[in-house]
């Protein structure tokens, strides 16, 4: 009976991607933490932008304009941060990626691995960022209401529009990093990767 290659087994690449992320935790830990923090900031600004309570505060138009400007600033900051941090992490994994080729993985296999790694990173950063944003958004709203004579409401509110906007933005940014990584993989040569600094 013909032996089945491990790479053809179901779940091989998802498991290997998870192992890689854990093994490179010293790089991916700060990377995911920074991504999650910016996702939380974006959600909080979106939450305040769409909040009916903020809309009823004196000077609401001015406040909402500030929130829109804040979302734009966080968007630009997040794009720069993700691309720079991703480049930093991938430079330190170049030798590892070159070794995969020596061990028999073709570039298409490494590309599949990168896809799974990006999916895991995106899920962790978006879910973690939204969770932190939801928890902190009420606190930020309470601080804002100190500037208003309106009574403080202690209920818990979640902005579905804010969650959707946050997930869409950071999903797109992680997609950009994946495309960039795949482009770099296609242009690279295994020998160059192996002689790169780890």
Regions picked out by a protein language model, each given a short descriptive name:
Residues 39-50, 84-88, 120-150, 161-187:
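Small-residue-rich transmembrane alpha-helices
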Residues 26-53, 62-98, 119-132:
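Hydrophobic alpha-helical transmembrane segments of multi-pass inner-membrane transport and secretion
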Residues 1-29, 92-96, 106, 141-162, ...:
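Feature of multi-pass inner-membrane transport and sensor proteins
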Residues 99-100, 113, 153:
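Short alpha-helical segment immediately N-terminal to, or the first helix within
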Residues 59-76, 148-176:
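Conserved transmembrane alpha-helices of multi-pass membrane proteins
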């Amino acid at each position: 009976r013909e032996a089945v290659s491990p790479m053809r087994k179901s779940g091989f690449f998802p498991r290997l991607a998870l192992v890689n992320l854990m093994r490179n935790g010293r790089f991916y830990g700060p990377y995911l933490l920074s991504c999650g923090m910016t996702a939380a900031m974006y959600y909080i600004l979106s939450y305040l932008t769409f909040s009916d309570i903020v809309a009823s505060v004196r000077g609401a138009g001015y406040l909402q304009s500030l929130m829109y400007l804040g979302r734009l600033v966080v968007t630009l900051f997040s794009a720069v941060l993700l691309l720079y941090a991703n480049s930093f992490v991938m430079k330190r994994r170049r030798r590892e990626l070159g070794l995969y080729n020596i061990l028999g993985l073709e570039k298409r296999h490494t590309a599949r691995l990168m896809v799974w790694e990006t999916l895991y990173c995106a899920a962790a950063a978006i879910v973690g960022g939204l969770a932190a944003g939801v928890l902190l958004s009420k606190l930020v709203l309470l601080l804002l209401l100190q500037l208003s004579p309106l009574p403080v409401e202690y209920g818990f509110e979640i902005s579905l529009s804010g969650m959707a906007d946050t997930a869409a933005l950071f999903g797109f940014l992680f997609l950009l990093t994946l495309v960039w990584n795949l482009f770099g993989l296609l242009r690279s040569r295994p020998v160059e990767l192996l002689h790169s600094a780890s």
